[in-house]
Amino acid sequence: MSELDQRGAVHGVFWTAIQSIGVRVFSLLVFIVLARLLTPSDFGLLAMAGVFVVLGDALVAQGFGAAITQREQLEPEHESTAFWTNMALGLALGALLWAAAPWIAALYGQDALTSVIRWLSPVIPLRGAVAVPVGLLQRRFRFRALAIRSVLAALLGGVAGMLAAFLGWGVYALVVQQLVGASLDLIVVWSAVAWWPKLAYSIRHLKDLIGYSSYLLGSGLLGLLSRRADDFLIGVVLGD
């Protein structure tokens, strides 16, 4: 490994550690405050909705972003095609979740869940819009920008959630936290990446990315389902 590569590795480890510690600390502090202002049922509603939001997030955030990061020969057409595919998928999944909200609420036996899910549904296209830029930042070893993005989203999203909780918004304070965090994530990433997609789409370049991204997506979804299946089943059984 060259000296430049070693410096890049050390730089990456340092900022990744800053990101991990910062997000954990701010998230914990925000949770402590929100736990004093909100009820367990508020957190329960968000957890029920979160199962589906996290699933949609995984579908748009995993796969293409990692393929952009790790593919050896990357052309502008790969980047633009991956971005437009992610945007279309994110919008479609967000719309599907919005439409399915009443049925999900009925499954859980929680009428209030319909509105919560619908307000959270924009998180999915917001995540889809940053997957490729994040992949490009990782490819360029821009770990400092990635760390700032995550810490700011956790901090300011948490502040927004706490303000909403102080105003008596109940479960929607948690929704505000998620929406503000995802929006700040989008703003910081796009400010840092210095890249714009072309108005072009290539099936050939899409096929180049699908093989690798489908493997990552499949393994990521299996891991996600194994972690969140219990949450879903408990919500269905105890929802009434």
Task: Please provide the spans of the model-predicted regions.
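Interhelical loop/hinge segments that connect adjacent transmembrane helices in multipass membrane
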Residues: 1-5, 9, 144, 171, ...
